[in-house]
Design a protein with these regions (language model features):
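Conserved alpha/beta-hydrolase
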Residues: 1-2
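Alpha/beta-hydrolase active-site loop
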Residues: 8-29
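Alpha/beta-hydrolase fold nucleophile elbow
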Residues: 32-42
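Short beta-strand immediately N-terminal to the catalytic nucleophile in serine-hydrolase-like folds
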Residues: 39-41, 65, 177
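Short glycine-enriched nucleophile-adjacent loop
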Residues: 46-57
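Accessory cap/linker subdomain of secreted extracellular hydrolases
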Residues: 65-168
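Short beta-strand/loop motif that positions the catalytic acidic residue
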Residues: 170, 176-178
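Conserved alpha/beta-hydrolase "acid-adjacent" motif
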Residues: 183-188
Length: 188
């Protein structure tokens, strides 16, 4: 089976469809015991495994490695805070950046706004904070561009996922593992 997709243009929905296609191919393979298919996913792959297992009752189990267990905005806020701690940001700076991230995520989740409208409003949130990211003014345009480039349809879809609802639809056994020292998916 060969993929015809473009990875960088793919969304969570595309990855769910890919995983469903793999499960279908495994079930069609005579040498595979279809009732013993387990899905293993890392990070957002844990969500993808749960989504597939919640829709396909024949899945025998799910292993989620550092996969999401609650809303993606909370996970992303935790990730950013962990990175800001590693970057040596003060409590005040971290609080300011977290507040800005929450506002940007709120804008991204507002379905009434086009992505262009979100970006126009996000610039107004980001620009006053550029000195918190870096005191070096020569880096501000690069930082703004990096942040704005992440405001994509894929991020919008991630922020709209019903993670808890997806997991509650899973009826097979689940093993969820998160590393104690993980800075991307904070164990708490």
């Amino acid at each position: 089976m060969n993929s015809t997709g473009v990875f960088l243009a793919s969304s969570i929905s595309d990855f769910v469809h890919d995983a469903e296609a793999v499960v279908a191919a495994l079930k069609a393979n005579k040498s595979v015991q279809a009732q013993r298919i387990f899905l293993v996913g890392h990070s957002e792959g844990g969500y993808i495994a749960a989504k597939v297992a919640g829709q396909d009752r024949s899945i025998a189990g799910v292993v989620s490695l550092a996969g999401p267990a609650f809303a993606m905005d909370r996970i992303l806020l935790d990730q950013m805070d962990a990175l800001n701690i590693l970057a040596g940001k003060s409590e005040s700076e971290r609080s300011t950046l977290s507040k800005a991230n929450r506002e940007i995520y709120r804008l991204m989740q507002d379905k009434r706004l086009s992505l262009d409208e979100v970006k126009a409003r996000a610039v107004k949130v980001i620009d006053p904070l550029l000195p918190v990211f870096s005191p070096d003014k020569s880096t501000h345009e690069t930082i703004r561009t990096q942040i704005m480039s992440q405001l994509t349809p894929n991020l919008r879809q991630l922020l709209s996922l019903d993670v808890a609802g997806t997991w509650s639809a899973v009826k097979c056994p689940v093993i969820g593992l998160v590393g104690e020292m993980d800075q991307q998916v904070v164990p708490s």
